C-alpha cells in the first residue's frame, strides 16, 4: 500500500490545537519547544486568543509547527509517506515531510511568509 501525507493550509487553526499531543508525546513537544519564532507558540496555540491565532503572522508558523509535530509522531511510529502534498501554506509542511527542510527551517520560512 502506498501512503501520501496531505497538509492543510491556513484556516484550519483552532485554539487548543496540539495541547493533548504536546502533553502526551515527546516528539511533538520537541518540535514546538524548538520552533524558531518570536512569540510564545504554545500559549497561543493552547490558550489563544482566537483573534491572535487567526492573524497570519502567527497562524502560519503555528500551523507548520503543528504539522511538523504530527509528522514527527508518524515518523516515530515508522509511518513514512511515498508522497507529500500541501494546500497553499501546507506546501511548507509537505516540503518538510519530503526532507527538503528541517522542521525548524519550515517553521522559520512560514514565519517569514506570515510576516510579509
Where on the chain are the PLM-derived regions?
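FabD-like malonyl-/acyl-CoA
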Residues: 1-116
Amino acid at each position: 500500500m502506498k501512503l501520501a501525507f496531505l497538509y492543510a493550509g491556513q484556516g484550519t487553526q483552532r485554539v487548543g490545537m496540539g495541547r493533548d499531543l504536546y502533553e502526551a508525546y515527546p516528539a511533538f513537544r520537541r518540535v514546538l519547544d524548538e520552533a524558531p519564532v518570536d512569540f510564545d507558540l504554545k500559549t497561543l496555540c493552547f490558550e489563544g486568543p482566537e483573534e491572535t491565532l487567526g492573524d497570519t503572522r502567527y497562524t502560519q508558523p503555528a500551523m507548520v509547527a503543528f504539522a511538523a509535530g504530527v509528522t514527527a509522531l508518524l515518523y516515530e511510529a515508522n509511518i513514512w509517506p511515498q508522497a507529500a502534498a500541501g494546500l497553499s501554506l501546507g506546501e511548507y509542511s509537505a516540503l518538510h515531510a519530503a526532507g527538503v527542510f528541517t522542521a525548524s527551517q519550515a517553521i522559520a520560512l512560514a514565519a517569514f511568509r506570515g510576516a510579509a
